[in-house]
Swiss-Prot record:
This is Large ribosomal subunit protein uL2. Belongs to the universal ribosomal protein uL2 family. Part of the 50S ribosomal subunit. Forms a bridge to the 30S subunit in the 70S ribosome. PANTHER family: LARGE RIBOSOMAL SUBUNIT PROTEIN UL2M, RIBOSOMAL PROTEIN L2.
Amino acid sequence: MAVVKSKPTSPGQRHVVKVVGQDLYKGKPYAPLLEKNSKSGGRNNNGRITVRHIGGGHKHHYRVIDFKRNKDGIPAKVERIEYDPNRSANIALVLYADGERRYILAPKNLSVGDRIQSGVDAPIKPGNSLPMRNIPVGSVVHAVELQPGKGAQMARSAGAYCQILARDGAYVTVRLRSGEMRRVQSEGRATIGEVGNAEHMLRQLGKAGANRWRGIRPTVRGVAMNPVDHPHGGGEGRTSGGRHPVTPWGTPTKGYKTRKNKRTDKFIVRRRNK
């Protein structure tokens, strides 16, 4: 991947930093693995906004990604690496020996022509998927399952990874990039290596319109609203809001902890770094 800074030929180009993948496939995606991706505009079935700042954006199909990696013992060859508009990571189209094609997350250093495999007998190399009980302690992995057979849920975005720190019976302890240490079931699968396209974090959109292309609408400050719309709204002239920062629903923000999932607290060994 190459990081390209644009010449300031216009105000919108002045701050643009693009991440260009010279090895990405230039053609159309594999049609049998495409699905309709409807836009909601952030509205629910009653037509009410349930998620703010969503709407518009370019149309695109959803690429069906194999997060379960359950074709054990059947080798596959990487046919091409593709851009995916639905995620920060790139994806790889792989052809299995039985003729089936699937999309997977493209790990770092995976290239066209490489061979990958799933199952307990798979070698420890980037792109191979194994149960975590079969992965050596200290290994770097991504696409980690929280529940065996459910599919990968952790470490799926560009440049993400976990490190296996310890193995204790039915659980392994992994460290996330945030610094959080967490116990996950050792029967769950993970893929060797870290997710590719780590340069994604260097990207700068350069103008507001680039966010609109992605379906992201503007975020209006509460102090710019009326009292009916936000706790910070109203007042004569410009104000600071007159109270500690809160969300539109009155919950404290900017550092206030809102995590309520006590059910999974027992799996978190150490909270993330601040």
